[in-house]
Structures are given as C-alpha cells and as structure tokens.
Amino acid sequence: MSFDWTPEELQKVVDENKIVIFMKGTPDQPQCGFSARGAQVISMRATELGMETFASVNVLSDPRARSALKEWSDFPTIPQVFINGELIGGSDIALELYESGDLQNMLSDDSNASE
C-alpha cells in the first residue's frame, strides 16, 4: 500500500478497512518483534473468526511515515492497530485484548463493516 501519508489518506485507510495495522515491515516479513507480535495476534483472531485478511501498512516504506502516523494518531509507538476505525494501541494491548477475549468481541461487532 503506497500513499502520501497525509492525515486524510491515513484516515481513509482506517475508514475503509475493518482491521488495519501500521507496522514495521509486513505480516509475512516483519522488521521488528513488536510488529511481528501485533500482526500475529491480529492474524490469529481474524482467522478464528473466518476473516481472510486485514490491511497492513509498512511504515518503513517512506521516511515520512513514522512521524506522520505518530502525529496523526497521537500515539507514540509502532505498531498501531486500528479496529472498526478506532486505535486500540500497539502489540501489547492487542495481546491483552486477545487473551481477555475482548479482541474477539471487537472483531465480531459490526462484522459487515468494510474488510
């Protein structure tokens, strides 16, 4: 996925996808442990719910990406996981939500949203 890292484009990708993870690398080739864990947690839960995919955006693809994302989301770390248009946090928070069962509830809600 390639774009100009404007607030409008960041908002658009979040609005158009039920699940988005902004990460270092890709789910298949993560470039940091936190991004790998975040993608793995989201992938496990999505698979369990029969969802085929989620959107991922590689913040290493452009030198402007990390600062633009952090400024837009007002969240200091990468990865950043968005579900149903809302920032839920990074990999630690995604893992906590997975372990508590709350992630399943979040993904089950409004299952007809854009995927």
Each PLM stretch: what is its role?
Residues 1-11:
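Flexible, polar/low-complexity N-terminal or interdomain linker segments that lie immediately upstream
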Residues 10-51:
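Local sequence-structure signature of Cys/Sec-based thiol-disulfide redox active-site neighborhoods
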Residues 20-22, 55-56, 82:
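Beta-strand cores of modular interaction/reader domains in eukaryotic scaffold and signaling proteins
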Residues 25, 48-66:
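Thiol-based oxidoreductase modules, predominantly thioredoxin-like and allied folds used
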Residues 70-77:
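Thiol/disulfide oxidoreductase modules built on the thioredoxin-like
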Residues 83-115:
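Non-catalytic, surface beta->alpha helical segment in thiol-disulfide oxidoreductase systems
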